[in-house]
Amino acid sequence: MTLQAPHTLKFVYRFDEGNASMADLLGGKGSNLCEMARLGLPVAPGFVISTQVCRDYLTKNQTLPEGLGESIRDNIRLLEESIGRNFGSTPSPLLLSVRSGARVSMPGMMDTILNLGINDEIVEGLASMMGDPRPAYDAYRRFIQIYSEVVLDVDPEPFETVLAAHKEKAGVTLDHQLTAEQLQDVVADFKQITKDATGSEPTYDPWEQLMAAVEAVFRSWNTPRAIFYRDHNKIDHDMGTAVTIMAMIFGNLGPSSGTGVLFTRNPSTGKAQVYGEYLTNAQGEDVVAGVRTPEPIASLKDVMPEIYGELMELAENLETHYADMQDIEFTIENSRLFLLQTRNAKRTALSAVRTAVDMVSEGLISQSQALLRVDAEEISRLLVPQFSDAISQDVLDDRFLARGAPASPGAATGTVCFDATKAARLAEAGVDVILVRPETKPDDIHGITAAVGVVTSRGGVTSHAAVVTRGLGKPCIVGCEAIQVDLEAGLFTAGEKTVKEGEQISMDGATGSVYAGELETVSPSLEDLPEANELLRWADQTRKLGVMANTDTPSDAAQALVMGAEGIGLCRTEHMFLDPKRLPSVRQMLLNAETAETWRRESNDRVFRAENEPDSSQAVKDFYEALDQVRKLQTDDFNGILRVMGARPVIIRLLDAPLHEFLPPYETLLVELMELRHIGAPLAELEEKETFLHLVDSLRESNPMLGHRGCRLGLSFPAIYRMQVEAIITAGAQLVKEGLDVNPEIMIPLTVDVEEMHRLREDLSLVASEVQERQGVKVHYMFGTMIETPRAALTAGEIAKESEFFSFGTNDLTQMVFGFSRDDADGKFLRWYIDEGVLPNDPFASIDPQGVGQLIKIAVDAGRRERPNLEIGICGEHGGDPASVAFCHEAGLDYVSCSPFRVPVARLAAAQAALSGS
């Protein structure tokens, strides 16, 4: 069935009609082949069916547009003329490869069909043309298998089983060791497998094969693995794939033929040396699929020195032309080199950073280009774990299992799992999994993504497993041939050692070593990565946004400085309360707060002085005793953090969390009370427990996150906020006396009205003045608020009258704007919303520009109109998300704040936002 299409739509582009700038229309593979052809490089002739045809096909009931078949036939005729072979003809037959290729590289996620155009008659003509029936029948059996799998949806397992049986019968281990006669038997068995599965053998009509293959490639855009990959990598689902149709180049014609993949630099380390591998007497899928372990590319120099020299020259020229590391696929047919593809290479974070920095020094790109070239998220992957130096060599020797090729760096420890689906399920349950396979396939993508590392017994450093894990930043070891995987028994052997599924192993993707059991891992320091520091130095010179960190302890503050933070954007004081040694005092303070506040109001006294209040209740005395203990602890806390940060700003949020977070659960206390009654505990103990239970019950709320917390606590129980401000200013004064410059900024949380800010600021300013007078020094401080409710955003102009800075608490603001509970939504419906396209992104991961973002812009504009020098930033988890950082730059914020380990990400993302907006 065909569909009428506008005559203006051009379906097909010859290689001489395109160039590298046409990736949206011709896909990355097609546009780069056009570019290489334009440069006069040795590319097999072919043409590209555009991505627009794919989009039309998928949106119009999987119907090819009218006229496409005719366009394909016209271009096949041109192909025949250029190569001197005939498609669908026995003499000098032309076979085709039909390959997918979207604008964004998706290695192995879509389908490819090779050796198309063959049948029982044409295989004889191919054998005659090749002068050898073995490669002809090898091509035929490959075609039947891949066509059956991709076009007819036949299970691949029976083909692999039959092929293995034929090799065993012949007494050989490799596919190319089978003779022509043996391959004819394989062909017959493969036909029968297809017939058993579908009711008929694959079509013998080359034109039917071709059109069915084109449709199959289009359909592969929406396979589960392709959708999963796009979801994981945030790739647009609507771009579609092009289809590249090329004359087949045969790498399986004998020892003077072969195929391989090379990178112009090391994709794991970024070292400026050609890196890759090849197979003689093979086709390209053998290398990528990892079914054979290839030879390193350097050894090609000894086998085919002229081809090696030509290949090195082409690799250098392509990298210079594209000004980026290239991933090049090539095939050698009877000592003649052909390039099948070039693309910007997938690489590890370390390689991405090193390549970008080195290319600046080599004059290939500018600093700005280098900053835009490295994905900001990649920076966090630089700090991949490594084995601890404390592990002795004796332990490593004792635990050693096997060594393979290091394909992607990083150390990991996990539970052995042999199945991708099971690995994903275990990972979802919180289990660290290492996926161990003979080789991985594109359908394993969900398991690879879920695993902490991947080990394969076959394949090379350019195989599917290696390419995908490098892109994911996960450790990977390939070609670990000492490991024999028995999938049926659920175990693998390495020499005399056996490891069963469910047992622990450790792996080092940098050395290729696999060890039994669990080994300690540590994360490296950013200080040890000179190229990363150079790139981030350029980022700091470029960005307009400040980058601060969310930290609560002096050690975290020191780590934040190492990561490049310019201050602390959020210090959560309630986290200091949760230390088990402090909880008794904190609980004593909170449980008696209401009684103490009632007494204070009745006595009309701002400050409690025990020696002057002999008639106050024990509860009041307990409250102020606990308050004093907590004040001393908080003073020490703030002293430590302010000391580490020096003159940098430190934004300290006053107590925000609901009180129940510091108290035992009501249900737990109730059970404890029942147990005391059951054992006949003393009356005094029972009364104490009952009093505690009553107090906890009085503080319980139906919806505590929208209840008695934040500034509402500060207004209800002013002594708590006064204590905290006294501790902050006292700590600052202590350091000022030592000659240090400090800049605490006091943040009042959860305001909804300017009157809250007015009352609290007036009261707390008095406390700050009293402390400074008592200490005899001045401390530079500011008061500001956290904008985390819609009303605060909408009335920001009024609130700015009492605030010297705003900090958007985007976690709570997102919850309130959407009406979603962050703790519950993901597991209940949010993931489904995103998968089904109800929402484009997780609003808790990236700022929602239409809702939350609009409120932020309203607040920024209103706040700055009232107070032009108002300091504005965000301190939610969004502060380390590159998309959110870009939004903050556009919205005119002064800074973002995030966890210390996300600071480098934010620094680079802020520079990229500045460059993209300039």
Show the residue positions of the predicted features.
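A short, small-residue-rich loop immediately preceding and capping a beta-strand
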Residues: 452-458, 476, 873
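Flexible inter-domain linker/hinge segments
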Residues: 214, 383-389, 393-414, 533-552, ...
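Residues forming the flavin
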Residues: 472-474
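Extended, non-globular alpha-helical segments
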Residues: 403-443, 494-534
